[in-house]
Amino acid sequence: MALMVKAEGGNGGKRWDDGFDYEGVTKIYVRGGLEGIQFIKFDYVKDGKTITGPIHGVSGRGLTQTFEINHLQKEYLLSIEGYYDISTGVIQSIQFKTNQQTSDMMGFNEGTKFSLRSMRGRIIGFHGFADKNLYSLRAYYIRIPATKSAMDGGQNTGRGYDHGGDYDGVRKVYVTFDGTSIRNMRVDYDKVGQVECYEYGVKIGTQNQFTINYPYECITSVGGSYADTQPYRCIVLRSLTFKTSNGRTSVFGKETGTTFLLESQGNAIVGFHGRVGSCVDSIGEYYAPFSPYPPPTEKLEGQGGDGGDSWDDGAFLNVKKVCIGQGQFGIVSVKFEYENDASEVVVGDEHGKATLLGYEEFELDYPSEYITSVEACQDKVMGAETGVLTMLRFKTNIRISPSFGLKAGFNFVLEKEGHKINGFHGKSSSMLHQIGIHVIPITE
């Protein structure tokens, strides 16, 4: 049965629907123009044959780009990202990701970002809204079955346990170790937003836990060791090591005997199976494609004066460069350089008034360096009816920038513990009145 993913994009246009009676998508056509994406068209696969879908939108002056998906090599479409203009509703750019590759961003990286994806699903059809341009996309998808691995550890002792592979992901793992062997395990799974738990073994020893930041993180591999162990007179697990998509690792027990590693490139672990008695004798996994959601961005309120017009660069993957323009009494303009999810450089607009002195720059050693806080000074100066910012200084995970401007009035700091800055907003006129930040959790 095909399930529907909610619409993404703007409002407007007439409804269209390609249906979902297909095995997958094999080619995508996107035509872009000055106002955004003019049309989109899909080639589908049905009974091994290519079915060409209709054009959704209108073909005007512009450029058509294509993206091919090789279904003969078991390639399938997983997700879509892009940007739309919130004022016109027209989709401005679009990018496609399969289990094997990612397309170029087609169109302009401007506007409000959207993402179209489903947990554990591959896209097999589309519907949406279009008129003279493309306004929104919806997708039909089917669930991708999990693949069952072999077991490592004792193969014949104890009794079997099998959680199956029908879960969306793992939320938490509890492991009990008695100083010699893994005695007990409990796994908390996520299934359509609900938690389901499995526990097996004998809870003797010290229990520790490992929490996964699902759905922004997944377990990508499980390793460990096993050995013939007394007094059980059989092979049992002596240690376990879990690794996540964010590079975090959690180790339980002591490595002894034969080591093993269970992982499948590009996949996440969504279930466990094996054998258990007085100890956990063996472990195996269920693998499935899993694309962790990007961490949610949080917009922190700006601080400073109330004058000027509001501006907002939005949120990006990271900040690459800060440009500061100074005047006689304070900061007159700022401009920021970002990197987006497609690893493209995005130069933000100039906020404030251009200065003949040009910009002073603070460039980050990206991607290892990122901004964690901004310190600023606010004061009321000649020629300004409300407070303006007279100084800015940026702190990263490595260093502190020089102070740009003059320390006057009172100062404030913008930051959130455990987060990094990935965008800026504020207010400006002929000077900078206010600054605020977008932040995301630090996962490195």
From Swiss-Prot:
<feature type="domain" description="Jacalin-type lectin 1">
    <location>
        <begin position="2"/>
        <end position="143"/>
    </location>
</feature>
<feature type="domain" description="Jacalin-type lectin 3">
    <location>
        <begin position="297"/>
        <end position="441"/>
    </location>
</feature>
<keyword id="KW-0007">Acetylation</keyword>
<protein>
    <recommendedName>
        <fullName>Jacalin-related lectin 42</fullName>
    </recommendedName>
</protein>
<dbReference type="InterPro" id="IPR033734">
    <property type="entry name" value="Jacalin-like_lectin_dom_plant"/>
</dbReference>
<dbReference type="InterPro" id="IPR036404">
    <property type="entry name" value="Jacalin-like_lectin_dom_sf"/>
</dbReference>
<feature type="modified residue" description="N-acetylalanine">
    <location>
        <position position="2"/>
    </location>
</feature>
<dbReference type="InterPro" id="IPR001229">
    <property type="entry name" value="Jacalin-like_lectin_dom"/>
</dbReference>
<keyword id="KW-0677">Repeat</keyword>
<dbReference type="GO" id="GO:0030246">
    <property type="term" value="F:carbohydrate binding"/>
</dbReference>
<feature type="domain" description="Jacalin-type lectin 2">
    <location>
        <begin position="146"/>
        <end position="289"/>
    </location>
</feature>
<dbReference type="Pfam" id="PF01419">
    <property type="entry name" value="Jacalin"/>
</dbReference>
<comment type="similarity">
    <text>Belongs to the jacalin lectin family.</text>
</comment>
<keyword id="KW-0430">Lectin</keyword>
